[in-house]
Amino acid sequence: MFCFLGLRLLKYITFRTAYATIFAFLLALIFGPFIISRLKKLKLDQILRKDGPKHHLSEKMGIPTMGGVLIFFCVLVSLFFWIHFFNIYFLIVLFVMVSFACLGFTDDLLKIKRKNSDGLNPKFKIYGQILFSFISVVMLYYFGGEHVSILYFPFFKSLKLDLGILYIPFGMFVLISASNSFNLTDGLDGLAIGLSIVVIGALIIIAYLTSRVDFALYLNIPNVKGCEELVIFLGALLGGSFGFLWFNAYPAKIMMGDTGSLSIGAVLGMVALILKSEILFAILAGVFVVETLSVIIQVVVYKKTKKRVFKMAPLHHHFEELGWSEMQVVIRFWIIGLIFAILALSTIKIR
């Protein structure tokens, strides 16, 4: 595809990444209003938690969900022009994106059909996540190259651990945890997608450094051959996410839904696995980790003591209950997410 165009610029990863990003963003701006209107006509409105903040019931009623459809449409169309499709890492990530998006889409659809926030049976939901994560991690394990099962630790120059076949359950844990943590964080206008943009931006830098032999040697990080196409994929995802944020910013005209949040979380988890940045990813996605821990702590403590640690979980609702406005919570969480990203990127050199 790139040869017959005869443009040398198309050989450069930075050029293709930049235009994949811009293209996906512009597609979102162009098709966003149409997709939002179609979702409204189909009455695919966000179903709100009855035990959530009371003001959400009036402010967010009637907003269409399944916004992940907009993101992934823009990403896939953009990638058609800018990526080498037959790259094994891209194909694995594409499988993760489509499979988890389908799972989230089913969950969203059932919520709308039943008119409650229960959606897909939790057992079926986790079974689906286990199945899709198992398939994708096994694919990575067998096609991922010599470093695939090795775990690298930030801050340490030579500390690493070869998990062998145990890398498969470990990788599944990363994917499922990332998917669910991004899903839990998607509770306020612009919150999850804004934090996702920060994580995606940092992963673009890591992917580019990891794809280059010279940078990998200089920084003492693994060089993953073939991962340069992930830079372009992440660029398209970044552009699509910025475009979605255009319509998801407060007051939101569209919600991401499980269609978007489950899939984006899983995709970024898989990218972290491919780039050998699993532990770094936990720092990078620090806000998502804290949000998930707040839910776990709330549930465990309440079951044992019948007392609540937080006024409401996940953590972003706790701050709403303390009197913070929605925009204050979102922007402050974005700032914290950016600090986590800077911290994570700084560890690349500190080895």
Swiss-Prot record:
Record's subcellular location: Cell inner membrane
Pfam families reported in the protein's UniProt record: Glycos_transf_4
EC number: 2.7.8.13
Pathway assigned in UniProt: Cell wall biogenesis; peptidoglycan biosynthesis
Cofactor(s) the protein needs: Mg(2+)
Record's keyword annotation contains Signal: no
Segments traversing the membrane: 17-37, 61-83, 88-105, 130-150, 158-178, 190-210, 230-250, 254-274, 279-299, 328-348
UniProt-recorded Gene Ontology molecular function terms: metal ion binding; phospho-N-acetylmuramoyl-pentapeptide-transferase activity; UDP-N-acetylmuramoyl-L-alanyl-D-glutamyl-meso-2,6-diaminopimelyl-D-alanyl-D-alanine:undecaprenyl-phosphate transferase activity
KW Transmembrane (keyword) present: yes
Protein name: Phospho-N-acetylmuramoyl-pentapeptide-transferase
Organism field: Borrelia recurrentis (strain A1)
Gene transcribed to yield this protein: mraY
